[in-house]
Amino acid sequence: MFQIYIWGAGFYAKQVLGEIDDSKAEVLGIIDSDRKKQGTKLFDTIPVLCPSDISGRRFDYLIISVRNYGPVEEACIESGIPSEKIIVYWKESPDNSVFKKRAERVEGLIWEKQVCQYRLDSAPYEWSLKPSPKIWEGAELLKKIAQDHSSLCRFGDGEFEMIRGKVRPWFQKPDITLGERLKEVLCSDDVRINIAIPQNFCGFDKYKEDAADNIRRYMFGNTRTDILALLDKDRLYYDAYVSRPYMMYKDGKNADEIFPLFQKLWKDRDVLIIEGEYSRIGIGNDLMAKARSVSRILCPFKNAWDKYENILNTVLEKANREALICISLGPCATVLAYDLAKRGYQALDIGQIDNEYDWYMQGAKVREDIPGKLVAERPAGQNLELDEEIDYQKQIIARIRGN
């Protein structure tokens, strides 16, 4: 049984007492330099002592509970208490044996500290103290596409990380050639092609707090600098979050506007969907209900870039020139939409719009499994069996299998 003293009879002492494992440790007393507290029974049977009371006594640990622990820790060491016997409640320690819940609490404190760093790092851009890329909102992008029948290439964190040679999406391994092709697309000045990047720089007030903090965390360090170096400060971009209009926003107004604008794009048109196996866009919902017809080319749900030439050639062979080609295939979709647009097709990289639509229709509060469909954020343990496959199977006109 460890013998323990706690320094500080203030507000946090009870919190510390509540986390000590009484099957492993016994609290001998609470130490406080406030004479008004000394000798009282603030903590039932545990006495409040003055610092000199423990002089010469044997104990295993002294736990410092006060938030301003620096001066106390220094004074304890100067008084002769070995540093290995001092545990600061507010710091990580190699010895968690006397606590029941300390690991979870410390993890929470570390995250709070990191969030503060992320917010401070992002603040100059959010407050327009530093210049950010010019990014038009998603609704304006979709209205433009409806008017001029242009194409869409989207860049999210997966595409930027691919350019940077880093691992991001679990469904596509890093590839130098893919990274170079993505750079080519990003620099394209073809008026038929809209380049979309995520609004990760400012205007965070419309996002949920956890979504905003996740963006700040991703952009922290060298990420923002690297991405800015890839962008043209004089160019007009569009918001890549157009394909994620629901879950990350504080209210449903954005989704209320965006989904009908998407559906207007394919109303009364022949739609060819290029998707990863198990994406099943429009199945189980009415997202594509207004299309004149829907056909599909299924591709590998993982590492589709390995089969890119096969995918491109199959699309060129099967696609109707007047069809609207909708692509959901990770970073591969960005390049494919570009290559098809260059050949005169209208191609849209629609990303995870179908998952977002399912959650929107369900009123979901968090990203959750969607039976019969692969959700990129939840790669493990999903139910991918489809209850009614007849119409879906009829729509499949080609299938490219992975390695």
For the regions a language model picked out, list residue spans one by one.
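Short, charged, surface-exposed secondary-structure boundary motifs
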Residues: 37-43, 94-101, 303-310, 349, ...
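Short, surface-exposed basic-aromatic patches at helix termini and helix-loop junctions that form
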Residues: 21-22, 78-80, 287-291, 317, ...
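Active-site regions of enzymes building and remodeling cell-envelope glycoconjugates
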Residues: 42-51, 78-85, 170, 209-225, ...
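A mid-sequence, solvent-exposed acidic-amphipathic segment
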Residues: 277-322
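C-terminal functional extensions of proteins
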Residues: 335-403
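Short, polar loop motifs at secondary-structure junctions
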Residues: 31-38, 67-69, 200, 276-280, ...
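Electropositive, gly/pro-rich neighborhoods at or near active sites that engage anionic ligands
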Residues: 100-289, 401-402
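Hydrophobic, well-ordered beta-alpha structural blocks that scaffold small-molecule cofactor pockets
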Residues: 1-110
